[in-house]
Amino acid sequence: YKFVSKMLDGYANVLEVGCGDGFGGTLVADTVEHLVGMDFDPLFIENATNLRTESDNRSFIVHDILEAPLKNRFDAAYSLDVLEHISKEEESLFMENILGSLDDNGTLIIGMPSLESQDYASIQSKIGHINCKSGDELKTFCKNYFHNVFIFSMNDEVVHTGFTPMAHYLLALCTNPTKG
């Protein structure tokens, strides 16, 4: 979330796809004008809404991105720890609906555990992580939807541009959508 908050600093209208309880979005909300947290689980959205403060620049909505894009358009979107839970059969729909929710010049950041990190993941994590990717696979996937894709690696809290097979976590910064 620190990386996202720095990369999207100053953006006006940002969407978090798969916000869960909204906890991580508080860092991003500090650097953007308005943050919309979206999740398919009504319980998550209820909890996130209850944690808001009066001065909070966030709102939350229940929506399944696999069903349709949002009607509103956003300058940027981010989705952390979501794509690895989306089946390969539905990953294109996931990206197309995010793209359909972005302005023509929208930016997207996707974060996920690396494929290589799964050798060290718990059994519970492995069960839910049905679509982890290597750095090269994530870049290739994102290049289907964006002209510019920059892959960053992360180990602990250190973000770098180093050798992705040694990364525990991957971040894809995607700009200049291929749509429209």
Regions found by a protein language model. Give the residues of each.
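Conserved alpha-helix/loop element of class I SAM-dependent methyltransferases that forms part
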Residues: 1-12
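Conserved class I S-adenosyl-L-methionine
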Residues: 11-20
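Conserved acidic residues
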Residues: 12, 33, 75
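Conserved SAM-binding loop of SAM-dependent methyltransferases across substrates and taxa
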Residues: 21-32
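S-adenosyl-L-methionine-dependent methyltransferase catalytic module, highlighting the catalytic core
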Residues: 23, 40-47, 51, 60-67, ...
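A short helix->loop->beta-strand "cap" motif at the edges of active sites that frequently abuts
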Residues: 32-33, 106
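Glycine-rich phosphate-binding loop signature in dinucleotide/nucleotide-binding domains
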Residues: 70-72
